[in-house]
């Protein structure tokens, strides 16, 4: 195809149509969104659920969302900043924390829907690929589709750790093991032991041991928060094992309690009641009459 220079004349600007705002901002892939949102026409009012996973510098966000005409609705959500409740106080954005957040989302959702006992998921974490199967007589498993947004879906990405946690928690997510840590492209096989190692933070503990031997100063600086919390390379796996058990025992969301003695500052005048307004009018009248005397 020959190169054609775009001539930006009057006709060009008259016919120009701007792209959607979120496309202009580089936030939404509308080609992917269309396929994740549009439901089969023979399913009528059945929502199409998707598991949305996003990463920030300090947090992991996992949500179950479905689309409506007026906008997307969030069914349930889980965040990595909730993990200190379950004993994971550091490393809230690593591979193991992503797995914990996905597991928390799944158990919270199924508890809210009354399916927690029927679909327990994978209780023995061995790193093998797992798929939720229909139990037969009872209700079908909750199905959601993975929404990674604009994340680059490379093998070993943390997005798939959160998805693995949600699947092991009991949510039916259509997937392939080809993007998990430990998958070998040449043999097309998943190395389950390596995936299990990452789920329990083994890669972090290996690096801790390496730094302790090679550079003590860098170890103290790099893992200062781990040292402060008393977490060692040997206690890492048990910390995540206990966290998984606590998440399964109580996945419910806890409201943040207000701090004692906290006084909120007002930057505007408080709204007066009717009684106060009438009293203010009386005072103004009295002050005006006093000036006339």
From Swiss-Prot:
Component of the large ribosomal subunit (LSU). InterPro entries: Rbsml_uL18_euk, Ribosomal_uL18_C_euk. This is Large ribosomal subunit protein uL18. Residues 247-283 are annotated as: Disordered. Belongs to the universal ribosomal protein uL18 family. GO terms for cellular component: cytosolic large ribosomal subunit; nucleus. Keywords: Cytoplasm, Nucleus, Ribonucleoprotein, Ribosomal protein, RNA-binding, rRNA-binding. The keyword Nucleus applies. Its main location: cytoplasm. It comes from the Eukaryota. It is found in: Cytoplasm; Nucleus. It comes from Suberites domuncula (Sponge). One of its GO terms (biological process) is ribosomal large subunit assembly. Residues 247-263 have a biased composition (Basic and acidic residues). Component of the ribosome, a large ribonucleoprotein complex responsible for the synthesis of proteins in the cell. The small ribosomal subunit (SSU) binds messenger RNAs (mRNAs) and translates the encoded message by selecting cognate aminoacyl-transfer RNA (tRNA) molecules. The large subunit (LSU) contains the ribosomal catalytic site termed the peptidyl transferase center (PTC), which catalyzes the formation of peptide bonds, thereby polymerizing the amino acids delivered by tRNAs into a polypeptide chain. The gene is RPL5. One of its GO terms (molecular function) is structural constituent of ribosome. Residues 264-283 have a biased composition (Basic residues).
